[in-house]
Amino acid sequence: MTEFTTLLQQGNAWFFIPSAILLGALHGLEPGHSKTMMAAFIIAIKGTIKQAVMLGLAATISHTAVVWLIAFGGMVISKRFTAQSAEPWLQLISAVIIIGTAFWMFWRTWRGERNWLENMHGHDYEHHHHHHDHEHHQDHEHHHDQGHHHHHEHGEYQDAHARAHANDIKRRFDGREVINWQILLFGLTGGFIPCPAAITVLLICIQLKALTLGATLVVSFSIGLALTLVTVGVGAAISVQQVAKRWSGFNTLAKRAPYFSSLLIGLVGVYMGVHGFMGIMR
């Protein structure tokens, strides 16, 4: 630590900027940075590349902001402040928001399917009742038509549900400010867990009155982190678009994907919450 401090005092840390970018990118590959959760979210909503970039940048911004808040707050509140003491609380808060997001995704998908089925059943009942009144004297033909109608209804269910699902995604996630805020909130939550290494570097720079240098290193670190997170999100968005073009059965699978994605995100939130709670109880 003494040698590193000496290098900072001599101004040699400017040579560390490329290394900080690389370390940030590698740091994004470590567990605990919501890459799986972010990719699952993008896949669940069939997100665009623009939304994937937005999600990754939001996570990076919150990650950097938390580093600054902890560093400055720690210096003001107590000299004995450590990043480890704040991390459990941040994990617990993030877990609550993440689990809430998972529940919202599951409920939105379930409600959409339920409403569609209720509307279809109501329409089928009216159509069957009308058909029964006008063709009651043709018993055999009526029975045959009813069976044929059931088969046709199943085909319409698949096609119409796929169209409804696509329209719902377009309506909810295409250029709507409120939906963009939901994506930003999810990304900001994903970056809540700070990096103790980045906090340590910033604290050292502040103590040595090298605030500009510390800010530059943290920004460089964040650029590397953003490259990783944005790459993960864009990769998920592109993969969804390419698979949909090449595999006709993808739309059928995609109808159930939000359930799996919400479950996966919920498990990540539970895991994060348990670790945060255990850290607080220590």
Swiss-Prot record:
Induction: By nickel and cobalt. Transcriptionally repressed by RcnR. Keywords: Cell inner membrane, Cell membrane, Cobalt, Cobalt transport, Ion transport, Membrane, Nickel, Nickel transport, Transmembrane, Transmembrane helix, Transport. It comes from Shigella flexneri serotype 5b (strain 8401). The chain crosses the membrane at residues 13-33, 57-77, 87-107, 183-203, 218-238, 260-280. Efflux system for nickel and cobalt. The gene is rcnA. GO terms for cellular component: plasma membrane. Residues 1-12, 78-86, 204-217, 281-282 are periplasmic. This is Nickel/cobalt efflux system RcnA. GO terms for biological process: cobalt ion transport; response to cobalt ion; response to nickel cation. It is a multi-pass membrane protein.
